[in-house]
Amino acid sequence: MAKATTIKDAIRIFEERKSVVATEAEKVELHGMIPPIEKMDATLSTLKACKHLALSTNNIEKISSLSGMENLRILSLGRNLIKKIENLDAVADTLEELWISYNQIASLSGIEKLVNLRVLYMSNNKITNWGEIDKLAALDKLEDLLLAGNPLYNDYKENNATSEYRIEVVKRLPNLKKLDGMPVDVDEREQANVARGG
């Protein structure tokens, strides 16, 4: 079996493909490497100018090694093997968008540190209960959330109750503007307020 691509190798490939210097690039695309990247390592700390780091479609099991990336705004980790939201302290103040759909996340513990998060794409993970969604309530700026494809969502969908699901999410996260790609409408907001006792 082929050895995993290292971050260092992936950066070199990116530089060759795009004719750029990775340490100066605002968007660094290391997605879909063949063979896949398995580990985020300290080489990432050299990407000082990076605002958007794309690591989707690899075999990464753990979020790590983001210290030094003080300009990071968008972290794309969709289609990996990640089980936990962790090791984001270094980017907690700057990160605005976390794209982490198609992973194996069952808990949102740790997400509350991302105080400036506006966008969270985490469809097709393993979220099963409302207690996890409640952890998002600490994120005042969160306005765009993708949850479809999680067991929690699927339970409602199977019972033709997606409108109830939407109201339940908005009840818990009143600042949301968009849920699963659809704007939160006035009607949903009113019903959520009533359900909240407002």
UniProtKB/Swiss-Prot annotation:
Annotated ranges, domain LRRCT: 157-195
Localisation per UniProt entry: Cytoplasm, Cytoskeleton, Flagellum axoneme
InterPro entries: Leu-rich_rpt, Leu-rich_rpt_4, LRR_dom_sf
Keywords: Cell projection, Cilium, Cytoplasm, Cytoskeleton, Dynein, Flagellum, Leucine-rich repeat, Microtubule, Motor protein, Repeat
Annotated site (Controls the orientation of the C-terminal helical region): 182, 185
The keyword Transcription regulation appears for this protein: no
Top-rank taxon: Eukaryota
Keyword Cytoplasm recorded: yes
Functional note: Part of the multisubunit axonemal ATPase complexes that generate the force for flagellar motility and govern beat frequency. Component of the outer arm dynein (ODA). May be involved in a mechanosensory feedback mechanism controlling ODA activity based on external conformational cues by tethering the outer arm dynein heavy chain (ODA2) to the A-tubule of the outer doublet microtubules within the axoneme.
Quaternary structure, from the entry: Interacts with OCAD2, a outer arm dynein heavy chain. Interacts with tubulin (previously called p45) located within the A-tubule of the outer doublets in a ATP-independent manner.
Protein name (database record): Dynein axonemal light chain 1
Lineage, top ranks: Eukaryota, Viridiplantae, Chlorophyta, core chlorophytes, Chlorophyceae
Name of the gene encoding the protein in the UniProt record: LC1
